[in-house]
Amino acid sequence: MNKTRTLTYVWPKSIRLFHWINVITISLLIVIGLIIFNGKTLGVTVDAKIMLKTIHVTIGYIFAINLIIRLVMGFIGSSNDMWSQTLPFMKGYKKELTKFRRSPKQVYKGHNPIGKLMVLALLIAMTIQMATGLI
């Protein structure tokens, strides 16, 4: 009884690229932000601090552009890019959530109803972060 596994990508390349750009930019923003914040303790010179702030802002722009592209793709992208597949306030979500509560072991192609809530929370947090640049 040999079963052959087939690799199937649920998310298109654009979504996977969006995720990896977020991983890289958010990680860099945190590390550079901490270095800037602890500059005196770490012995960072004024010139180095200015350079780090410039790099930090540039990476912030990359993060913002990536997020804006994803927000737009939610309206004009392929089927799994669309907000109707990703966010929790679309038609049929309440039924999907009720079904999930009754049978949480159900397999979903994409996000389950709780995952959709998390996606919404992350998109809101990232949009606030992009708009303020302070978080």
What does each of the following model-derived ranges do?
Residues 1-135:
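Membrane-embedded alpha-helical bundles that constitute the cytochrome b-like, heme-associated redox core
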